[in-house]
Amino acid sequence: MKIKLMLLTMFWCCTSLFGQDYFPENSGVKSKNNNYTAFTNAKIFITPTQVVEQGTLLIQDGKVVQVGTSVTIPKNSVTIDLDGKSIYPSFIDIYSDFGVSKPKRAEGGGRSPQYDATREGFYWNDHIMPENNAISKFKYDDKKAKELRDAGFGVVNSHIQDGIARGTGVLIALNGKADDSKRVIDDKSGHYFSFSRSVASRQSYPTSLMGAMALLRQMYTDADWYAKGNITTKDRSLEALNANKGMVQIIAAGDKGNVLRADGIGDKNGIQYTILGGGDEYETISDIMSTNAKLILPLNFPDAYDVSNPYQALYVSLEDMRHWNQAPANPKILAENGVTFSFTLNGLKSPAKLKGNLQKAITYGLSKTKALEALTTIPAQTLGKANSIGSLQTGRYANFLITSGDIFDKGTTLYENWVQGSKNVINDKDQRDIRGDYDLMAGSESFKLSITGEPGKPKAEVKKDTNKLKSKLTYKDAWMNLSFTQNEKLYRMTGLVKGNTNTIKGRLLLPDGSESSFKATQTKAYTEKEKGKKEAEKPEIVAVTYPNIGYGYSSIPKSEDMLFKNATVWTSEDAGILENTDVLVKGGKISKIGQNLKAGSAKVIDATGKHLTAGVIDEHSHLAALAVNEAGHNSTAEVKMEDVVDPEDIDIYRNLAGGVTSMQLLHGSANPIGGRSAILKLKWGESAQNMIYSNSPKFIKFALGENVKQSNWQSFSRFPQTRMGVEQVFMSYFQRAKEYEVKKKSGKPYRNDEEMETLVEILNGERYISCHSYVQSEINMLMKVADHFGFKVNTFTHILEGYKVADKMAEHGVGGSTFSDWWAYKYEVKDAIPYNAAIMQSQGVTVAINSDDAEMSRRLNQEAAKTIKYGGVSELDAWKMVTINPAKLLHINERVGSIKEGKDADLVLWSDNPLSIYAKAEKTVIEGATYFDLEIDKQQREAIKNERNKLITMMLKEKEGGGKTQAPKNKKKEKFHCNSL
């Protein structure tokens, strides 16, 4: 009875399972083949680290049933003998746009930017689209799917690659024999982000990287606010953002710096992003490791530059030459340092290029096991799908590759790519390998035939005696077609390759049109020994420096104790200038100032006949920035210059050579209320974060005049358009900030607004204003606005009409940071005079000389000297204008700006009076570490020449060996100013 019940139960189970296939069919008798298929005698990579020899893989219904060396094969199974062949899990691309069309670029443009969103019921910014779902835009692409399968891929994770918040992805099996009901593994497989605007919207904000970062921060804050039910309206974007939080969060960074930026945003919001990198992570490996993020790595290694023309070769920077040489080692370095990563085809022009670049990465030291993990188990784990894809363990999809051998070897042929149990033939595995050397009889004539290349894509070389003849060979479905030309006469032949015989026979069409026969007899089997030796040669990789460009250091400079002996010391303090004086540096601080000091273990520097000063400080700079303006709104107090510090800007090194040790990196003047400043120490070789002053005073850039009212922008749609309007912008925003603070302090729920938080800091005296200014009426206006709201303007920068209102500035307590002798470069500076600095100082204003220019900043010592000529300022007071005075304006004078015991050892040793045009900075020291040394600089120049020649030789060799090259490009570095966009 029990047996009968069991059989009946099995019958009904089978019937119900069959009945679940509810789509009607009109193609004949409805049937389903549930036979097992067994692949025997293969080397099977169950996972990258679990490999069996002479194993069996048993599959049924698109899934792995059993795998190993002791598999019981059911009766009536289809058995395929794979003796001598290998089985691998099919690859996974975690970052794809397969089947998802690119959005159309928004129409319009012209002179009127779009400041508001175009959508209703969604987030206030069109570039935030978490509600997008790739599945709704997905259409299976058979042609592209075949290209991907031919490269070894069985699954791709696709999404809409547009916008800052991009919505969800879709995980697709590349099963061309099924429909979306089967091949869609997950219709919400991840949540995607980037720093790039949507091409489908013309909404102006954000216009910069720092704006995109600020928008992401505010988006997350708003999502939390929305989730708490504190908003009465419906926002489909924020609803989707909150709904998608449980998915893997993937962000496109694109380079090593943006990897760190993305991770910082994630950390602030409790999110561990998986990050699409750029292939240069090896340059800052310790910082990358500290993120604990999983990376997605493109394999788009750069081609060598064609440097055969020595003059064009000058266009190629040492940085680009190094990256060509070092980039293929990136995966190896990440793997050695414990960074988890997946590979992606993103950035490659064709999937067919994957294998060659994988081989290059392996040649550069990446283990084959790590390479396979990056294509299989790691992307599966990252997506949370390790129980269904990425390996050949029991229960997983039957996604696997059949190869002739090691999948990463050049000579290996990919025969088949099975996806969800469906067979896809790439190359016929039963087709004979015909490579080798042959004696060829074509009619009555004899030739030598050599067949090389890959088994599935062979190449022919035909010779008559020693003459090489133009030839073409195709080989498919066991048919070989060969043609060659001798003395402009064409021979064509076709033959069927049979069994294991060493002879190929067939029909021949002679040049005169008559028909004959041919016979090719193999004399030597093909061997890859010579190629193997060549591939075994390890490439020479040049050393990474910090930063990894010209003039970078082999290691980051370290603080050391030092004693400057017998210097002329410019203290920038009441002590004035001290002759024949010693300065002892210990632990990065100025320890003692005096004569005949004992060095102890400190390094002694003979400064006899030389001048020692505090480091030059530039109150107004735009160097070391990746962006300078966020122009999308008339107030952008939420953006931070600290987000876009570029620690690899060569102008940092050049400024160190000019004695500059600190600077304020200011937002530009595109709007009345700009972004927050970054105060930096020019620690060449350090990360951006390590350059920013610890416990830095808070600053923000304001602006007045032509730029903020868009006088020269040819755009008239943004408020303000007049100087009167500029005042009202300030009044409006500060009033809103007051109201915001009242609500915040009330204890009632409030929406955290980064922009308002910044303005509240100004009202409370916690953040200082550096204001771009020219015209006296506007200077006076902003001081009155500040008085109205009860705060002080800290600094007027540029301030070319400061001499007209110097008494009012002194009364208000605001400083002036000005140019020495700039005028006549635009209309609103028509009243500028070179006596401006001296006049403001005479009225009790703290005056600094600034640059607003990457070139002028390294000559600020000479700019300060001009105040002696124009105004009769003393040498000591002139020098204070580029040392202690800017330090006071930046509220860092307790640490830097003068030579005083206890202050940071930010010092410059000059060859002459620092105000002289003949003076050279011989050593520039920051916190006891030497970041510029004139003698070392000379050595570096010679080393750069030698390294360039070495890399050029490597590139020439690459070209000679048939490697692909790219044309040299003259990349001109952009120099930012206040009005740069």
Name each region found by the language model.
Residues F39-A42, K429-K448, G456-T466, S471-L473, ...:
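Tryptophan-anchored aromatic micro-motifs
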